[in-house]
Amino acid sequence: MRNRLILVAAVFSILGLTIQSSNAGSVNELSEAESAAGFEALFNGRNLDNGWEHKGNWKAENGVVTREGKGGSLVYKAKKIPDDFELKFQWKVAKGSNSGVYYRPGQYEYQILDNGVHNDGKNPRTSAASLYFCMAPSHDATKPVGEWNEGRIVCKGTIIQHWLNGKKVIHFDYSDSKWKFNIDMLEKRGAKLPARGAHLSLQDHGDPVWYRAIKLRTLPADEKLDVKKVEPAKIAADVLEAERKKLEGIVNRRKK
Protein backbone atom coordinates (compact mmCIF):
# COMPACT_ATOMS: atom_id res chain seq x y z
CA MET A 1 0.00 0.00 0.00
CA ARG A 2 2.80 2.40 0.94
CA ASN A 3 4.58 1.74 -2.38
CA ARG A 4 1.35 2.38 -4.25
CA LEU A 5 0.90 5.74 -2.50
CA ILE A 6 4.48 6.69 -3.34
CA LEU A 7 3.87 5.76 -6.98
CA VAL A 8 0.65 7.81 -7.13
CA ALA A 9 2.41 10.81 -5.57
CA ALA A 10 5.24 10.52 -8.10
CA VAL A 11 2.76 10.39 -11.00
CA PHE A 12 0.95 13.52 -9.79
CA SER A 13 4.29 15.27 -9.30
CA ILE A 14 5.30 14.48 -12.88
CA LEU A 15 1.89 15.58 -14.17
CA GLY A 16 2.20 18.82 -12.24
CA LEU A 17 5.61 19.56 -13.70
CA THR A 18 4.34 18.70 -17.18
CA ILE A 19 1.35 21.03 -16.85
CA GLN A 20 3.57 23.79 -15.43
CA SER A 21 6.04 23.38 -18.29
CA SER A 22 3.22 23.32 -20.86
CA ASN A 23 1.65 26.49 -19.46
CA ALA A 24 5.03 28.24 -19.34
CA GLY A 25 5.66 27.28 -22.95
CA SER A 26 2.26 28.40 -24.18
CA VAL A 27 2.54 31.97 -22.89
CA ASN A 28 5.75 32.39 -24.88
CA GLU A 29 4.12 31.20 -28.10
CA LEU A 30 2.13 33.43 -30.41
CA SER A 31 -1.64 33.13 -30.44
CA GLU A 32 -3.44 33.15 -33.79
CA ALA A 33 -4.45 36.76 -33.17
CA GLU A 34 -0.87 37.77 -32.36
CA SER A 35 0.45 36.05 -35.46
CA ALA A 36 -2.17 37.78 -37.60
CA ALA A 37 -1.22 41.14 -36.07
CA GLY A 38 2.43 40.62 -36.99
CA PHE A 39 3.97 39.86 -33.61
CA GLU A 40 7.29 38.04 -33.30
CA ALA A 41 8.16 36.04 -30.17
CA LEU A 42 11.58 37.21 -28.96
CA PHE A 43 11.88 34.59 -26.22
CA ASN A 44 11.33 30.95 -27.18
CA GLY A 45 10.76 29.78 -23.61
CA ARG A 46 13.67 27.32 -23.69
CA ASN A 47 16.95 29.23 -23.95
CA LEU A 48 18.56 32.55 -24.82
CA ASP A 49 20.22 31.33 -28.01
CA ASN A 50 18.03 33.21 -30.48
CA GLY A 51 19.71 36.61 -30.32
CA TRP A 52 20.00 37.43 -26.63
CA GLU A 53 23.38 38.53 -25.25
CA HIS A 54 24.52 38.70 -21.62
CA LYS A 55 27.57 38.04 -19.46
CA GLY A 56 26.46 34.74 -18.00
CA ASN A 57 24.16 36.27 -15.40
CA TRP A 58 20.81 35.50 -17.06
CA LYS A 59 19.16 32.17 -17.75
CA ALA A 60 16.01 30.61 -19.20
CA GLU A 61 14.28 28.19 -16.87
CA ASN A 62 10.76 26.70 -16.94
CA GLY A 63 9.69 29.11 -19.66
CA VAL A 64 10.94 32.18 -17.80
CA VAL A 65 13.91 34.54 -18.16
CA THR A 66 15.58 35.39 -14.87
CA ARG A 67 18.87 36.83 -13.64
CA GLU A 68 21.12 34.74 -11.43
CA GLY A 69 23.89 37.16 -10.56
CA LYS A 70 25.35 40.57 -11.32
CA GLY A 71 26.82 41.17 -14.73
CA GLY A 72 24.70 43.63 -16.66
CA SER A 73 21.58 43.80 -18.77
CA LEU A 74 20.13 41.14 -21.03
CA VAL A 75 20.09 42.58 -24.56
CA TYR A 76 18.26 41.34 -27.64
CA LYS A 77 20.83 41.76 -30.42
CA ALA A 78 19.12 39.86 -33.24
CA LYS A 79 17.32 42.98 -34.43
CA LYS A 80 16.69 46.56 -33.39
CA ILE A 81 13.33 47.80 -32.21
CA PRO A 82 11.34 49.34 -35.08
CA ASP A 83 10.64 53.07 -35.13
CA ASP A 84 6.92 52.49 -34.55
CA PHE A 85 6.21 49.38 -32.53
CA GLU A 86 4.22 47.48 -29.95
CA LEU A 87 6.06 45.45 -27.32
CA LYS A 88 4.30 43.08 -24.93
CA PHE A 89 5.89 41.26 -22.01
CA GLN A 90 5.03 39.72 -18.67
CA TRP A 91 7.06 40.49 -15.56
CA LYS A 92 7.16 39.85 -11.85
CA VAL A 93 9.41 40.94 -9.01
CA ALA A 94 10.43 39.80 -5.55
CA LYS A 95 10.03 41.97 -2.47
CA GLY A 96 11.91 45.24 -2.98
CA SER A 97 13.08 44.40 -6.52
CA ASN A 98 13.93 46.92 -9.23
CA SER A 99 14.49 46.40 -12.97
CA GLY A 100 13.48 48.04 -16.22
CA VAL A 101 12.80 47.60 -19.93
CA TYR A 102 14.79 49.93 -22.23
CA TYR A 103 13.35 50.41 -25.71
CA ARG A 104 14.78 53.54 -27.39
CA PRO A 105 18.28 55.10 -27.45
CA GLY A 106 19.19 56.85 -24.22
CA GLN A 107 17.11 56.57 -21.10
CA TYR A 108 13.72 55.40 -22.35
CA GLU A 109 12.83 53.00 -19.55
CA TYR A 110 9.60 51.24 -18.61
CA GLN A 111 10.16 50.91 -14.88
CA ILE A 112 9.81 47.46 -13.27
CA LEU A 113 9.43 47.74 -9.49
CA ASP A 114 7.98 46.58 -6.21
CA ASN A 115 6.18 49.83 -5.45
CA GLY A 116 5.40 48.89 -1.87
CA VAL A 117 8.94 48.40 -0.60
CA HIS A 118 11.45 49.98 -2.99
CA ASN A 119 12.18 53.65 -2.37
CA ASP A 120 11.40 54.55 -6.01
CA GLY A 121 7.80 53.54 -5.34
CA LYS A 122 7.34 56.68 -3.23
CA ASN A 123 7.51 58.83 -6.37
CA PRO A 124 4.94 58.07 -9.09
CA ARG A 125 7.44 59.31 -11.68
CA THR A 126 9.82 56.46 -10.77
CA SER A 127 7.21 53.84 -9.88
CA ALA A 128 6.28 50.70 -11.81
CA ALA A 129 5.21 51.37 -15.42
CA SER A 130 6.51 54.95 -15.32
CA LEU A 131 8.60 56.36 -18.12
CA TYR A 132 11.39 56.55 -15.59
CA PHE A 133 12.16 60.03 -14.30
CA CYS A 134 9.90 61.55 -16.94
CA MET A 135 6.25 60.58 -16.79
CA ALA A 136 4.24 59.05 -13.95
CA PRO A 137 1.55 56.45 -14.61
CA SER A 138 -2.01 57.59 -13.94
CA HIS A 139 -2.32 55.11 -11.06
CA ASP A 140 -0.70 52.05 -9.52
CA ALA A 141 -2.02 49.09 -11.53
CA THR A 142 0.51 46.53 -10.28
CA LYS A 143 -0.46 43.13 -8.94
CA PRO A 144 0.86 41.84 -5.59
CA VAL A 145 4.55 40.95 -5.44
CA GLY A 146 5.17 37.47 -6.82
CA GLU A 147 2.29 37.63 -9.31
CA TRP A 148 2.72 38.13 -13.04
CA ASN A 149 2.05 41.59 -14.51
CA GLU A 150 1.37 42.28 -18.18
CA GLY A 151 3.41 45.17 -19.56
CA ARG A 152 2.89 46.82 -22.93
CA ILE A 153 4.69 49.64 -24.70
CA VAL A 154 3.27 51.33 -27.80
CA CYS A 155 5.29 53.97 -29.66
CA LYS A 156 4.31 55.73 -32.86
CA GLY A 157 5.86 58.98 -34.01
CA THR A 158 6.08 61.26 -30.99
CA ILE A 159 3.50 59.34 -28.96
CA ILE A 160 4.57 56.96 -26.20
CA GLN A 161 2.11 54.76 -24.32
CA HIS A 162 2.75 52.54 -21.33
CA TRP A 163 0.16 49.93 -20.40
CA LEU A 164 -0.03 47.77 -17.30
CA ASN A 165 -2.40 44.86 -16.77
CA GLY A 166 -4.72 46.00 -19.54
CA LYS A 167 -4.85 49.64 -18.41
CA LYS A 168 -3.27 52.51 -20.31
CA VAL A 169 -1.37 54.39 -17.62
CA ILE A 170 0.72 56.75 -19.78
CA HIS A 171 -0.16 58.61 -22.98
CA PHE A 172 2.70 60.99 -23.70
CA ASP A 173 3.24 63.09 -26.82
CA TYR A 174 6.65 64.69 -26.51
CA SER A 175 5.83 67.19 -29.28
CA ASP A 176 3.26 68.76 -26.92
CA SER A 177 4.75 71.79 -25.11
CA LYS A 178 2.52 70.93 -22.15
CA TRP A 179 5.14 68.37 -21.16
CA LYS A 180 8.22 70.60 -21.45
CA PHE A 181 9.30 69.98 -17.84
CA ASN A 182 8.99 66.21 -18.28
CA ILE A 183 10.89 66.31 -21.56
CA ASP A 184 13.68 68.33 -19.95
CA MET A 185 14.01 65.67 -17.25
CA LEU A 186 14.24 62.90 -19.83
CA GLU A 187 16.86 64.76 -21.85
CA LYS A 188 18.94 65.54 -18.76
CA ARG A 189 19.15 61.81 -18.15
CA GLY A 190 20.49 61.33 -21.68
CA ALA A 191 17.49 60.52 -23.86
CA LYS A 192 17.57 61.73 -27.45
CA LEU A 193 13.95 62.31 -28.41
CA PRO A 194 14.17 61.80 -32.20
CA ALA A 195 16.62 58.87 -31.92
CA ARG A 196 15.47 55.42 -32.96
CA GLY A 197 17.00 51.98 -33.45
CA ALA A 198 17.74 50.73 -29.94
CA HIS A 199 18.18 47.12 -28.92
CA LEU A 200 15.67 45.86 -26.38
CA SER A 201 17.38 45.67 -22.99
CA LEU A 202 16.22 44.09 -19.72
CA GLN A 203 17.97 45.81 -16.85
CA ASP A 204 20.06 44.02 -14.23
CA HIS A 205 19.62 46.16 -11.13
CA GLY A 206 20.98 43.51 -8.79
CA ASP A 207 17.54 42.23 -7.74
CA PRO A 208 15.47 39.12 -8.52
CA VAL A 209 13.21 39.66 -11.53
CA TRP A 210 11.43 37.41 -14.03
CA TYR A 211 10.25 37.96 -17.61
CA ARG A 212 8.33 35.90 -20.16
CA ALA A 213 5.98 36.26 -23.17
CA ILE A 214 8.21 38.90 -24.80
CA LYS A 215 6.60 39.78 -28.13
CA LEU A 216 7.29 42.59 -30.61
CA ARG A 217 5.66 43.89 -33.78
CA THR A 218 6.05 46.81 -36.16
CA LEU A 219 3.04 49.13 -36.19
CA PRO A 220 1.67 49.61 -39.72
CA ALA A 221 1.59 53.21 -40.92
CA ASP A 222 -2.19 53.16 -41.27
CA GLU A 223 -2.91 51.65 -37.85
CA LYS A 224 -4.68 54.05 -35.51
CA LEU A 225 -3.70 54.30 -31.87
CA ASP A 226 -5.96 54.52 -28.87
CA VAL A 227 -5.72 58.31 -28.46
CA LYS A 228 -7.54 58.57 -25.14
CA LYS A 229 -5.37 60.68 -22.87
CA VAL A 230 -4.57 59.81 -19.28
CA GLU A 231 -3.19 62.24 -16.73
CA PRO A 232 -0.09 61.36 -14.68
CA ALA A 233 -0.53 60.86 -10.95
CA LYS A 234 0.07 63.88 -8.74
CA ILE A 235 3.37 64.11 -6.87
CA ALA A 236 3.62 65.50 -3.33
CA ALA A 237 5.80 68.55 -2.69
CA ASP A 238 8.29 66.73 -0.45
CA VAL A 239 8.66 63.97 -3.05
CA LEU A 240 9.30 66.58 -5.75
CA GLU A 241 12.10 68.08 -3.66
CA ALA A 242 13.72 64.67 -3.19
CA GLU A 243 13.33 64.10 -6.93
CA ARG A 244 15.07 67.40 -7.72
CA LYS A 245 18.07 66.42 -5.59
CA LYS A 246 18.24 62.96 -7.11
CA LEU A 247 18.13 64.33 -10.66
CA GLU A 248 20.85 66.83 -9.77
CA GLY A 249 23.03 63.93 -8.64
CA ILE A 250 22.35 62.02 -11.85
CA VAL A 251 23.29 65.02 -13.98
CA ASN A 252 26.49 65.62 -11.99
CA ARG A 253 27.55 61.98 -12.36
CA ARG A 254 27.00 62.18 -16.11
CA LYS A 255 29.38 65.15 -16.31
CA LYS A 256 32.27 63.20 -14.78
Please name every model-derived segment.
Residues 21-256:
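Carbohydrate-interacting regions of secretory-pathway proteins
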Residues 1-9:
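Bacterial N-terminal signal peptides that target proteins for export
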Residues 8-18:
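Bacterial N-terminal signal peptides
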